[in-house]
Amino acid sequence: VGQNPPNGAIVYYWLKEPVKKVTIEFRDSTGRTVRSFSSDTAGMGAAGAAAGGRRAVAADAPPTNKIGLNTFSWNLREGDATTFPGMIMWAGVTTGPLVLPGNYSVRLYVDGQQAAEQKLLVKKDPRSDATGADLVAQYKLLMAVRDRTTDANDAVRTVRNVRGQAVGAKDKLGTDSAQYAKLVDELNQKISAQEAEIYQVKNQSGQDPLNYPIKVNNQIAALAGVVGSTEARPTKQAQAVFDMLTKELEGYLVELRKVYKDLLPSIDDLRKKHNLPPIEVKPNTVITP
């Protein structure tokens, strides 16, 4: 049985000799880099699958660097929202939105040097009645949904990174260990409470959301499947739900910033006393591009 051709923009390139690294870069008409893929990059796919949507939805495999003819397929999507290990969502979409119809370019870099550039035209689906303004409105909301999903997931990643740094030093402060442990326990209690509002921490398997209600990161991510289900202007209801969830998320983020500001200085003072570095308030290792 034959295979269907890949969706999206297909790039063919010929390598006449072995190379270490191939990079394929897509840019829009303003020169902005939309996506960049390298042969030494793993895990290009998103954790969430799109629930419908126009044009391609499959994740992109990294480009190859073999001698001879190589083929790469870009799924015509912007970068994905970040994820974290073990994240479970119910109908949540972390896949980036499809780009707008228009002029793009693709560049091929071989071992860091630009080797070729070609123009690329992304056309609107001829079956769609959506206007250009409709597609722009849809794209803007989908990008906002993706960015807020990243904000929510990065907050969880930051909580887990801060917790790991703080708890990991409990037995390294000698006579100050008891005082340090008390401060860390308070920190952990407060940031864990906010983490549990952003993400359903009880989820351990794909069916767990049936028993435990989804939280704000999943609710925001699920909007992408609704808004991107067809080529059309987003409904007023979709925008209203997004605004409501964004406000809810911001409340949790504000509280987390307050906890870090209030508790970390005392914790870091004790760490400094014992030649330990201050706790870094940032997400742990990035999982998706």
Q: What is the role of each PLM region?
A:
Residues V1-T23, R27, T71-S73, L142, ...:
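Contiguous beta-strand segments within globular domains
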Residues E117-D151:
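Low-complexity, Pro/Ser/Thr- and charge-rich linker/hinge segments at domain boundaries
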